[in-house]
């Protein structure tokens, strides 16, 4: 009997390679579909999989075919409708629609619906955050000297007794003994069967029985001489030290929850911060996040309170900036940490407080942060806070600001703020 062992990496998912090739080939169309789909999701359903539709025209392969028009001669088999020398009318032209529902009705032509397929959560998030990175991320070189961690790295045939893998060694022993004795055991079984037959036959065949018993004893001795365990079987757990990235990063999320922020505006701010959280947790292994909510007073909160607390009040934006400055001085040394901040507000602030916000950012925060992003969520005209921040944008390269009017603007603005650039790929 012949045995086939499937050692492919994707043995249980044999179409994985084709699927990955398809995702690479039609990445632009898939990303366009994803950017449209994310705006239709609820705030709590941003990170699941997605059904992606692609127009049929975008996935059609080029091919050679007969053009319309012209005169051609063909030979067709006869049937009960046509006989020799009949002239067949040319079918009416007209192509079908792509199935998107956009177009006019027609009695002619045919087409296909859009191609729809499901992508997994991992594929969805990979495409969602592709080409994004934290700007100006740098590594603290003096921390790289001792930044090594031990990781398991499979098995090796050499090692110290303390690292021996008993299970893997016994598996190898069983496999070796089975391979070395399988033929002898089959032969032994055949001889024992033959001896059993001869011993019950008439007349007795004593010489033949004696010969079979000698051969059986020799085979059993050979089988027993195969060692139970051999140095060839031994396997040891292998460990290796790998350098760990020494970059430490912290993201400050500052959200305005004042009375001027209606529920729709707060939902858009939360959607932006959920995208930011997923991006950080998906792209970077260890990034700390500090959540700050503010109205007239600012407070550092946990993740649940940041997204679900109903507390509200007036508006003094500088309270959040002062609290961030205090937390940085207390816990995050700029020489050891890459500090980032993302602030979301509707721009409504006490007029006398906006110049103070400018001063705190210019003198205390922007000199120590790698990147500070501000998004203003409003359909109204910009107020004093936006105008003060415009002066900062003209002065500091690590300050960026964007305007969000509707829910459809969130993802494009997010990509604009965190678009990967060659200058950001620090060594």
Curated annotation (Swiss-Prot):
Coiled-coil intervals, chain numbering: none
Organism: Salmonella paratyphi B (strain ATCC BAA-1250 / SPB7)
PANTHER family named among the record's database cross-references: UPF0229 PROTEIN YEAH
Region (Disordered): 79-110
Domain of life of the native organism: Bacteria
InterPro entries xref list: UPF0229 (IPR006698)
Pfam families given in the database record: DUF444 (PF04285)
Signal peptide: none
Gly residues composition-biased segments: 92-102
Biased composition (Basic and acidic residues): 79-90
Family recorded in the similarity comment: Belongs to the UPF0229 family.
Official protein name in the record: UPF0229 protein YeaH
């Amino acid at each position: 009997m012949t045995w086939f062992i499937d050692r492919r990496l994707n043995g249980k998912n044999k179409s994985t390679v084709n699927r990955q090739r398809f995702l690479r080939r039609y990445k632009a169309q898939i990303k366009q579909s994803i950017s449209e789909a994310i705006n239709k999701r609820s705030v709590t359903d941003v990170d699941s999989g997605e059904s992606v539709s692609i127009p049929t025209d975008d996935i059609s392969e080029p091919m050679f075919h007969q053009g319309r028009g012209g005169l051609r001669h063909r030979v067709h088999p006869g049937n009960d409708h046509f006989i020799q020398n009949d002239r067949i009318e040319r079918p009416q032209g007209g192509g079908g629609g792509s199935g998107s529902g956009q177009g006019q009705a027609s009695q002619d032509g045919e087409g296909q619906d859009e191609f729809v397929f499901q992508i997994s959560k991992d594929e969805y998030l990979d495409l969602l955050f592709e080409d994004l990175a934290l700007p100006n991320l740098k590594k603290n070189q003096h921390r790289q000297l001792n930044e090594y961690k031990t990781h398991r790295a499979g098995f090796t045939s050499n090692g110290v007794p303390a690292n021996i893998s008993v299970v893997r060694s016994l598996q190898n022993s069983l496999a070796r003994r089975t391979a070395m004795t399988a033929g002898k055991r089959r032969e032994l079984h055949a001889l024992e069967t033959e001896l059993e037959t001869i011993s019950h036959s008439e007349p007795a065949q004593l010489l033949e029985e004696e010969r079979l018993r000698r051969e059986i004893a020799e085979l059993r001795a050979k089988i027993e001489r195969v060692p139970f365990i051999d140095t060839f079987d031994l396997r040891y757990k292998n460990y290796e030290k790998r350098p760990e990235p020494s970059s430490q990063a912290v993201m400050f999320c500052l959200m305005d929850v004042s009375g001027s922020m209606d529920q729709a505006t707060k939902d858009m701010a939360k959607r932006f911060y959920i995208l930011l959280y997923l991006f950080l947790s998906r792209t970077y292994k260890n990034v700390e996040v500090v959540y700050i909510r503010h109205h007239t007073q600012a407070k550092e909160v946990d993740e649940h309170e940041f997204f679900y607390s109903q507390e509200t009040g007036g508006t003094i934006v500088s309270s959040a900036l002062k609290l961030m400055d205090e937390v940085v001085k207390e816990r995050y040394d700029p020489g050891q940490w890459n500090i980032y901040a993302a602030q979301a507000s509707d721009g409504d602030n006490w007029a006398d407080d906006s110049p103070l916000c400018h001063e705190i950012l210019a003198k205390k925060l922007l000199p120590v942060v790698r990147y500070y992003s501000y998004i203003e969520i409003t359909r109204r005209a910009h107020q004093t806070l936006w105008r003060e921040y415009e002066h900062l944008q003209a002065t500091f390269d690590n300050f960026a600001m964007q305007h969000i009017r509707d829910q459809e603007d969130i993802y494009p603005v997010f990509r604009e703020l965190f678009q990967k650039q060659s200058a950001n790929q620090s060594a």
